[in-house]
Structures are given as C-alpha cells and as structure tokens.
A protein has these predicted regions:
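Histidine-centered nuclease catalytic patch
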Residues: 455-488, 505
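Basic- and aromatic-enriched surface patches that contact anionic nucleotides/nucleic acids
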Residues: 2-293, 333-334, 366-373, 377, ...
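Intrinsically disordered, low-complexity N-proximal targeting/linker segments that flank membranes
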Residues: 374-465, 473
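A cross-family structural signal marking well-folded subdomains
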Residues: 2-25, 270-417
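Short, amphipathic alpha-helical segments that act as regulatory/interfacial helices
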Residues: 67, 122, 222, 343-351, ...
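Short conserved micro-motifs at the rims of enzyme active sites and ligand-binding pockets
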Residues: 91, 218-220, 297-299, 357-358, ...
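Short Cys/His-centered divalent metal-binding micro-motifs
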Residues: 485-515
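Conserved structured core elements
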Residues: 32, 60-64, 115, 212-215, ...
Length: 563
C-alpha cells in the first residue's frame, strides 16, 4: 500500500470525470492531526472504514513497527479521507470492539488511504482483541522496551518480551495517568515513559481530506492510491453507494442471496443453474430497466432510492428471462449461453411486458435474436453500445414488428461449421451447443435424457462434451485429422464418455450401444446426426461425417434465424 499521494493528480481531477454537466475544479485540503484529534473523530463516529477497503489484516508485528517509527520520528505516510454526507457500507466493528454510528445528517470521513495504519493505532489505543484464524490477538500486548539499546536492539517497540528487561505496554502508556509509572518504575524509566507518551500524543499525522467529491471520483482516488491503478468495479462502487441501513439494503448481501438463495427465498441463480451470471451483468440489468442504458457511467448515475426500488422488479424480469431461455429455448444452463448480455436484453423485454408470457410470434423473434447474437459474435466488442441498440430491437418485438437485421447475418454457411474448432469460450460454438441442447439429446446407451450441468461444461475437456470420433481414436488411426471440430462434438453423460466409449471407433461403440438401445437411430437424431452422417460414422469415415453433420447443424440454425 502506498503511504503517500501525488496531490498534483488530485488537484487536477475535476467533476468532468463523472457524469455532470458543469465541471468544477476540486481541491484537496492538506493538514496535520494530533493523535487525540484523530481518535476523537473515530470515537464520535466521524471517521469510518468503508467496506471497499480490506478488513484489518495487519499482524501485531506490523503494528509494533508502526509505533516504533512514530517514536523514532520517522514519517509514516499520509492519511487520506473522503468527507461526505453519503452513507456508505462500512465496518461496524474492529475485532470485538463496536464502532460508534455517525450522527444522522453529519459529515463522515471515510478512510481512502491509511486504513491499516489507523486501525492499528486505534486497536492499540483501545486494547482491542481480534480473533484471526482461530487465534486471539490482544493489541495490549505490544510493548516499549525500556532497556532499549540502539547498538543491539533493532526496535524500541516489540511484541515479545525478553527475560531480564523492563517493558511497558503501549496501551498503558496511552491510557494510564503518568503518576502510575512514577509509582511503578524508577524515576529514569518513568521519565522515559513520559517522553514516549509525549512523542505519541504530539505526533503530527499528515492528512489530506477531499470534501464533497462525487463518489465516482472518490472511488477513483481510492483505486489509484491503493491498488496500483486497478479500478474498483462498478459493482463495488454501487455496493458502497446504495447501502441503506434503514431499508435493510446491502447490495453485496442481496447479490449473494440472488445467487445462492436463503432458507426463506429458494428462487436463486444457483437453483436455476445460472449461477455463472456475474455482478456486472446484474448491475446492467438494473440499469436496463431503469435507464434503457447500461454503460458504467449510466449505472453510476442511478440514485440510491431508485436502485433499491428497482431491485425486485429487476429480479422478476431476470428470472422470467431465465425461465424463457430454459423452457422455450431449452438451454438448461448458463455456461452454454453465447453471451450473458442476451440476458440483459431479455430482462429488458420482460420488464417492459410486465413479465407476461410472450406470444408465439414474439417467441420466434426472441429466439431469432438469441441465435443472431451468438452466431454473429455480436458482443465481441462494444457491448454497452450494442445493448442500447438491442433495446430498440426488443421494443420492436414488443410492438409486433420485426427487428432489423442484415440478410447476411441471418444465414449460416455449413462450410464454416466444418472448419470451426471447438472452444467453450467461442460464442459461435456456444450457439451450436445451444442448438444441440435444444434437441434434448438422449444418452447413447439408454435413450435417457442427458443432464447438463455448468460444472461439466466449463472447458473443452469437461465431462458433458464428447468427441463423436474420439480424439485418441483419431490420433492413433488418422493423425492428419483434427478431432477438435465443433461438428465432432456431442453432449452426452460423463460416464458413457469416459467408461463406455474411450478411444473406440464409432463403428465399434455404436454397434455395442445398439444391442442395448433399440432406439439408437432416434437417439442419434437428437444429436443432429442424421442418416448420412450415421452411415459415415458406421464406416468410420470422419471427413464425410463432419461434412454431413455440419450440413444438418447449419440447416437447423438457419431455421432459427429465419423465424
């Protein structure tokens, strides 16, 4: 963590960086604070620890070194505060010590830089006990060595006592009357304690306060000085910005509940098997139904009350969109969705239609949109801008009109499918996998429905993905052939993939499955393996199989696109 700050960059920061109409030059305030003044502000609730900071993680030894630096007159860096009337999500306690609330309507100073140092000083002053990894740490147990010898001792302040030496607790030095030490120690040692107390309480802590900066700029300041330029995410900023204790709204907790559910609320992303949906997508869903715009700067303009009011409507629209994808499009898991951005557009659609069941015509057009997005790799760049355009497509569908698409965007060439390498991160491949999932593929051996799961679909080697012509078979028998083509991929259960097929030739394992599954021909149809492709597989002709299956896939995709 940096302990200093380039105030030049701060003085040049303007509100123009945030969504405001009239840029105003912002100027930080530099001043010193004494120990007593600093901790009086904490005890009165004026200084707070925002939750986008790390928890208190310093070891006792680090805290001892900090006190040691103060006693030796070393600089310990600058503390930076953001003074505002914004109510942010902040830590309520340090260890077992409860922090006071800020009086309603008062300014509060959030620590942007120096949280670990200030918390260390406060923990020592209060004698706080903290439980960490099952071990209790008592900050009263940081000591000044009264027999300190600069020639042999590295530090004045230590966490472990040596036999035969005199020590005094830093906590006691700060909190007990001086008379106590004159009664307990020799005159010389008591005078030492008095000198140490004076050094601590009279130390000038360098502080910079940025007052009434917009939250977006305060967060940018935090990012630049604390994380090497790594910006806080929009979600982290909105967690801080939308926190409302009176309404019991904590965005971080609400997102966890949305993802994992609770004992009272069973509907959640995990139960729907859409648990891979990120915080950023959820933020964009809120912005979509609130503003019909999803840029980061748009999200940051949403007021706390508006965001909270739109949280439940967003959830309703989101789950209606997920239900549509699962039931109408038959895509059972989020891992197969070409781009999560389609959820934002669909949530927008269902919010605008009050989550009503779409008409048959609307279903066809929404399905067309879904496949158009993936097959044209629509969100490969400029997602935020393109989503705004896609809301217009949703508006057209709502009003019974056909969205505008270029003719070339509604045609799939089977040759491209023949040549496309399989990748779980490729939207084009994912669209084909969605098509395969739509067929409700059956198990080769039993004709039972294949159960798909996000955990088995993450990477190309995951259990649900099966190379119809096994990779090991091709490597041993046809080294010149590429097994990793999308047209060679089927969705089957992991057990059959690993234990029943292995590296067998298709002709061999299909013959075995046929003895136990009299419906194997129909089973293979659910994988878009039509008669011509099946004949090629039964004669182990990989080239013809890929060609014929690519044609079957292209035909089915073109039906979706021409809805």
């Amino acid at each position: 963590m940096k302990h200093g700050l380039n105030t030049e960059f701060m003085s040049e920061t303007t509100v123009a960086a945030a969504p405001q109409n009239n840029p105003v030059l912002l100027q930080p305030d530099n001043h010193d604070k004494k120990y007593e003044a600093l901790f009086l502000d904490i005890d009165s609730g004026q200084i707070k620890l925002p939750m986008f900071q790390r928890e208190f993680v310093w070891e006792k030894e680090q805290s001892a070194k900090l006190i040691d630096s103060i006693l030796k007159g070393f600089p310990i860096g600058t503390f930076i505060f953001w003074k505002t009337r914004e109510e942010l999500r902040s830590y309520k306690e340090i260890g077992y010590h409860k922090l006071p609330e800020t009086p309603k309507g008062d300014y509060v100073q959030y620590i942007l830089d120096g949280q670990q140092r200030i918390t260390s000083l406060y923990a020592i002053r209060k004698g706080i006990r903290i439980s960490k990894d099952g071990v209790e740490i008592d900050y009263k147990d940081i000591f000044i060595n009264l027999d300190y010898n600069p020639a042999t001792d590295e530090q004045v302040v230590v966490t472990e006592k040596e036999e035969g030496k005199k020590y005094v607790s830093v906590h006691d030095v700060l909190c007990k009357p001086l008379g106590t030490f004159y009664r307990t120690y020799t005159q010389e040692m008591a005078e030492q304690v008095e000198a140490y107390k004076s050094k601590l309480t009279s130390y000038d802590f360098s502080t910079i306060t940025i007052k009434d900066y917009p939250i977006e700029i305060a967060c940018e300041v935090f990012s630049r000085i604390n994380t090497g330029g790594k910006a806080l995410t929009v979600f982290e900023i909105m967690v801080a910005k939308t926190y409302d204790e009176t309404k019991n709204f904590d965005l971080a907790e609400r997102f966890e509940m949305l993802r994992d559910g609770t004992d009272e609320e069973k509907e959640c992303l995990t139960a729907a098997r859409f648990e891979t949906i990120s915080e950023s997508i959820i933020m964009q869903c809120v912005a979509a139904i609130t503003l019909s715009a999803v840029r980061s700067r748009d999200i940051l303009t949403i007021r706390r009350e508006t965001f909270i009011a739109n949280w439940e409507p967003m959830k309703a629209a989101l789950f209606t969109a997920i239900d549509f994808i699962r039931s109408e499009l038959r895509v059972p898991v989020s891992q197969l969705v070409p781009y999560p951005g389609v959820l934002i557009a669909l949530a927008y659609f269902f919010h605008k239609t009050s989550n009503q069941k779409p008409s048959n015509e609307q279903v066809r057009r929404l399905e067309q949109y879904f496949y158009w997005v993936g097959l044209n790799e629509h969100y490969s760049s400029g997602t935020e801008t393109k989503l705004a355009e896609d809301f217009n497509k949703m508006d057209a569908i709502i009003t019974g009109k056909a969205p505008d698409y270029a003719n070339t965007e509604l045609q799939v060439d089977p040759k491209r499918i023949e040549e496309t390498w399989f990748s779980t991160g490729n939207a084009y491949c994912k669209s084909i996998l969605c098509l395969l999932a739509y067929q409700q593929p059956k198990s080769f051996d039993t004709n039972g429905v294949v159960i798909l799961d996000n955990s088995n679909l993450k990477i190309a080697t995951s259990r649900n993905y099966h190379h119809f012509f096994p990779k090991n078979y091709l490597e041993e028998n046809h080294k010149d052939k590429n097994p990793n083509l999308i047209a060679n991929i089927t969705l089957i259960d992991g057990y059959s993939n690993k234990h029943r097929i292995g590296k067998k030739a298709p002709s061999e394992y299909l013959a075995k499955f046929a003895t136990g599954n009299p419906s194997l021909h129909a089973t293979l149809q659910t994988h878009l393996i039509k008669d011509a492709a099946l004949l090629a597989a039964q004669s182990d002709d990989y080239g013809i199989f890929i060609q014929q299956r690519a044609q079957a896939i292209a035909l089915a995709l073109n039906v979706k696109l021409l809805s």
